[in-house]
Structures are given as C-alpha cells and as structure tokens.
Amino acid sequence: MTFADELRELLPADLPLRDEVAAKAARHLDLIVEANQQFNLTRIVSPREAAIKHVVDCVTPWRLFKNADRVADAGSGPGFPGIPLSLVLPEVRFTLLESTQKKARFLESVVRRLELKNVEVVAERAEDWLAKHRVAIVISRAVAPLLRGVPLFAPALRGGARILFYKGPDVTAEIAEAAPETNKRQLRLRVIERYGLPDDLGARTIVEMTRVKS
C-alpha cells in the first residue's frame, strides 16, 4: 500500500480535513523518502510504520492546538509534528525551527511544494528565535529529555505561552528528574493527554509546561 492508502485507513475518523490531510501528508512522506539518502531524515521507510509514527502520532492530539494563533515547532527535523498539524489546522500559523541548514532547506521545499500558506521555516536555533518572538505554544518532539528541555524552553513562557512535549508512555521518572529545574523557575510539568498508536506501535504522552501563577 502507498502512504496515501495507509493514511486514509489510519488517520482518526474525526480528524478535520481528513482527505486533504491524507493526500498532503502522503506527499510529505514521499518527499522525505526522495531526500532521505542525501539528508538522512528518517530510518522509518515502511509506508505503514511511517504513516503511524510520523503522521498519526503527530496529529492525534490536534485539539490541543486548535485555539492557538501561532505555534513553534522546535527542532522540526523533517517537519514533525509541525507540518502534519499545519494540515489539520490551516487557520493556525506554524513556525518550523530547524538550525541544520540542509534540513531547513528541505523544509522550505516541502512548504513550497505543498503550498502551505500557514507555515514558515526559520533556520535558527530554537532557543535563540524563541528569545525574540512570542508564540502561544512551543512543541518539542524528540528534541531533549525534560531535564534539558525545561531550561531550554523556559524563556519562551511569556504571556501565557505553553510548551508541549511529545513523550513516550512513562514520563513519571523524567518529570521527577526535572523537578529541581521546574521548582527554581516556578514552572509546572503535567500530563495533559495520553494515547496509543495503531498496530501496538507504542503509547504517547503529552506533557505540558507552564509558568506557575503567583
């Protein structure tokens, strides 16, 4: 089966713009496969596994982002989760932050070829860009453990902003390990969503970081 076939089967039934998301997300995956030998963007090339781990995983918690005006995807890599989420939520502006120049150029080509009007690519370190710009939500997926992620993204918590970390099934120890960092900065980490992936390919947890109101 093709990427498009797999996505039409696997995407959540209640996903907004489901058919369009399936078509454009499949094209995104095709572009990754084309560029993979040159850029080493992913080790997952099986259509079904890629559809699940790269797209279904990214879009399942889409409701967490629907009221945001601007979202930053920190360390976007080949475009996950920012590009799949941008397909589901065309009214939300997404900024893909990727400091590796060759990956940023790849992302720019994807945005251009998929005609993603609500997406921009910035070839800059996430922490540097976030120090100068305000967004509603920062996404971190497979970037750093919470112990490093807390100090890295804490400066972005301005004006009610939130950091959402895509994590694996058990984050209890990771949250506890990061407690000294959150306590001294008056921040809070909490689990706000859990979900399983199709074909028993794992469970996911979304951890939210916010500033404690005084």
Range-by-range predicted roles:
Residues 1-72, 102-119:
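Class I SAM-dependent transferase core
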Residues 75-79:
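Class I SAM-dependent methyltransferase "Motif I" SAM/SAH-binding loop
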Residues 85:
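Aromatic pocket-lining residues of Rossmann-like dinucleotide-binding sites
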Residues 82, 91-95, 99-214:
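S-adenosylmethionine
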